[in-house]
């Protein structure tokens, strides 16, 4: 009996952990993912070499709620909106458009 109860609790716990939970939709604005990759960082960049390597990048001082707001914020700073990965070696940052 104890083995059955323990096994049942273990199975139900595993199911609860494995089931995805969808975020609730409500009237407030939800933040859109600015970059497609989870390892990218949304940054405003100034100098671009071949459209890929950026030297002067900063993170936005605000948190834009969508890509249009992100582009507008960076444009107001005189920079381009980019999704960047910091390389392990070197000074440059590898970036792509959002």
From Swiss-Prot:
Organism encoding this protein? Botryotinia fuckeliana (strain B05.10) (Noble rot fungus)
Q: Which domain of life is it from?
A: Eukaryota
Outline what the protein does.
Aerial growth, conidiation, and dispersal of filamentous fungi in the environment rely upon a capability of their secreting small amphipathic proteins called hydrophobins (HPBs) with low sequence identity. Class I can self-assemble into an outermost layer of rodlet bundles on aerial cell surfaces, conferring cellular hydrophobicity that supports fungal growth, development and dispersal; whereas Class II form highly ordered films at water-air interfaces through intermolecular interactions but contribute nothing to the rodlet structure.
Where do the record's glycosylation annotations fall on this chain? 26, 54
Pfam family example for this protein? Hydrophobin_2
Q: Quote the InterPro entries the UniProt record gives.
A: Cerato-ulmin_hydrophobin, Hydrophobin_sf
Spell out the family assignment given in the record's similarity comment.
Answer: Belongs to the cerato-ulmin hydrophobin family.
Task: List the signal peptide residues.
Answer: 1-18
Q: State the compartments where it is located.
A: Secreted; Secreted, Cell wall
> Could you tell me the keywords of this UniProt record?
Cell wall, Disulfide bond, Glycoprotein, Secreted, Signal
High-level lineage: Eukaryota, Fungi, Dikarya, Ascomycota, Pezizomycotina
**Protein name, UniProt field:** Class II hydrophobin 3
Question: Per the record's keyword annotation, is Disulfide bond included, yes or no?
Answer: yes
State the deletion phenotype: Does not seem to affect germination and growth, formation of sclerotia, ability to penetrate and infect host tissue, nor spore and mycelium surface properties.
Q: Does the keyword Repeat apply?
A: no
GO CC annotation: extracellular region
Disulphide bonds annotated for this chain are 35-83, 44-74, 45-57, 84-95
Q: Gene for this protein? A: Bhp3
